[in-house]
A protein has these predicted regions:
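Cytochrome P450 core scaffold surrounding the K-helix E-X-X-R motif
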Residues: 76-82
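Short Gly/aromatic-enriched secondary-structure transition segments
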Residues: 58, 83-84
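Short amphipathic alpha-helical signal-transduction/dimerization elements
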Residues: 7, 147-150, 154, 194
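Non-catalytic DNA-recognition/assembly elements of restriction-modification systems
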Residues: 1-52, 62, 67, 176-220
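Extended hydrophobic-aromatic, low-complexity segments
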Residues: 115-116, 139-141, 153-155, 182-186, ...
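A short beta-sheet element
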Residues: 69-70, 86-148, 156-159, 167-168
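Low-complexity, Lys/Gly-biased intrinsically disordered segments
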Residues: 36-76, 91-94, 158, 166
């Protein structure tokens, strides 16, 4: 049974992906206890708020530039966009194209406080903030750092009926960061885990495409 075999492969990969995620987060928590330097997120990283091209203009949509809404941030990794926009849509709206491996956070709505990682270059809507890698600290630090910080960040800032945080809340939040040597030692361990996890996540994307092709061919 071809479909069953594909489903088994996807399920096996998902089990490993979740285990690797737990290893990453545990390693981060274990190592970060030793880090003494405290800085604001915005002093180290560029934080970018997304936007939405006007839905009244058809020429802004269905192009070849990936765009994700905050609902996608609910996923462990973002491998596919919600929609596609055009170059005109990108240039005539507040959205920005974020490179893959950008850590993204949902700042309002049902997915408030969710953190994910882009596995594709993509724009986002205005309910999402992207935190870009800098020259020294990469996604293997930023992503687990945000997973660790987000609960406190949200609790500090959400008041009354308006359940949201803003870009300034993220930028002014203080975190502990490793020295260059500490980060090198940490990254040597964690980066290969991220790479293997990413490989499995993208493999699952291909397996799903294969499954859908098979279903269309024989049952379409």
């Amino acid at each position: 049974d071809t479909i069953g075999s594909i489903d088994d492969l996807i399920e096996n990969n998902n089990t490993i992906i979740i285990k690797l995620e737990n290893i990453i987060l545990n390693l981060y928590r274990k190592k970060s206890i030793e880090w003494k330097k405290q800085v604001k997120i915005g002093d180290l990283f560029k934080c970018i708020l997304g936007g939405t091209p006007s839905t009244k203009k058809n020429e802004y949509w269905d192009g070849d530039i990936a765009w994700v809404n905050s609902g996608e941030v609910n996923k462990l990794r973002i491998v596919s966009p919600s929609r596609y926009i055009t170059k005109d849509g990108l240039e005539n709206s507040a959205t920005k194209l974020l490179p893959k491996k950008t850590t993204v956070i949902a700042i309002t709505g049902a997915t408030l406080g969710q953190v994910s990682l882009l596995e594709i270059d993509s724009c986002t809507n205005q309910s999402v903030i992207g935190i870009l890698e800098n020259n020294t600290l990469k996604h293997d630090f930023i992503y687990p750092m945000m997973i660790n910080a987000i609960k406190k960040l949200v609790l500090n800032k959400t008041g009354g009926a308006q359940q949201h945080i803003n870009k300034n809340d993220v930028e002014t939040f203080e975190i502990f960061v490793p020295s260059e040597i500490e980060y090198f030692e940490y990254s040597q361990i964690v980066q290969p885990i991220f790479e293997y996890q990413s490989k499995l996540i993208l493999q699952n994307k291909e397996l799903l495409l294969l499954k859908n092709k098979y279903l269309q061919k024989f049952f379409g």
